[in-house]
């Protein structure tokens, strides 16, 4: 993942992905590009390209907190959480960071979230878990009702824990999804607590609704 926090221009992503992929020996589709900052400013690629070799050379396993600080814009503090837990007899890790403090509506907007795990999980099972977790966390928060142009939640799983692959819809898969939902919800709450001009943290709970969609409409009315 490569990101910039000066301009929210997402129209230079192919060029950025090509440059990073070439420097790391990857394919373009193995590079995720994210941008946040001022809307409408072109990405200054002429200034970025000469610095990419230096940036790529600084990659390291202990840079998670640096990432959490680097993606801050109007945030007043970094937002990061990391946990480890037993999953079917194997100790696994799950961690992530996020940024966002304003223009958080509707369904994410003006926020980035990067999550990594060493769990070995099929792509479709991970995707389903991510979509469910996002719906119950980042899609359910708002700070000021202002909308924005782009947002991203990325989850990367490398299987480095050495565990046997998770079976779709099995017990370990359900346990991992529960952990992922908890992590995303806590990260989402951290965005609200650090929101621009926020003085209160309010949780709305709807009971007795016939459907989830009905409850959602009532809560967001």
Ranges and model annotations:
Residues 140-156, 188, 202:
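A structural-propensity feature for long, helix-poor, extended segments
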Residues 14-138, 143, 148:
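Glycine-rich, mobile lid/loop segments that gate access to catalytic sites or pores
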Residues 9, 13, 123-130, 173-180:
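Short, charged, low-complexity patches
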Residues 8, 43, 167-168:
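Short, solvent-exposed loop/turn segments at secondary-structure boundaries
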Residues 11, 25-26, 193-195:
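Surface-exposed helix-capping loop/turn segments at secondary-structure junctions
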């Amino acid at each position: 993942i490569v990101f910039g926090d000066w301009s929210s221009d997402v129209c230079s992503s192919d060029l950025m992905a090509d440059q990073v992929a070439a420097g790391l020996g990857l394919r373009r589709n193995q590079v995720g590009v994210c941008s946040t900052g001022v809307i409408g400013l072109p990405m200054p690629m002429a200034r970025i390209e000469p610095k990419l070799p230096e940036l790529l050379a600084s990659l390291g396993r202990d840079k998670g907190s640096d990432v959490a600080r680097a993606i801050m814009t109007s945030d007043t503090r970094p937002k990061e959480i990391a946990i480890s837990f037993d999953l079917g007899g194997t100790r696994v890790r799950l961690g992530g960071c996020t940024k966002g403090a304003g223009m958080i509506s509707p369904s994410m907007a003006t926020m980035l979230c990067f999550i990594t795990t060493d769990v070995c999980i099929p792509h479709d099972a991970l995707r389903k878990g991510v979509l469910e977790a996002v719906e119950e966390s980042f899609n359910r928060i708002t700070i000021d009702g202002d909308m924005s142009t782009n947002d991203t939640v990325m989850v990367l799983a490398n299987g480095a824990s050495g565990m046997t692959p998770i079976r779709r819809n099995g017990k370990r898969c359900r346990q991992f999804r529960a952990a992922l939902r908890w992590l995303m919800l806590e990260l989402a709450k951290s965005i609200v607590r650090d929101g621009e001009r926020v003085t209160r943290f309010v949780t709305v709970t709807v009971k007795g609704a016939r459907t989830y969609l009905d409850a959602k409409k009532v809560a967001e009315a």
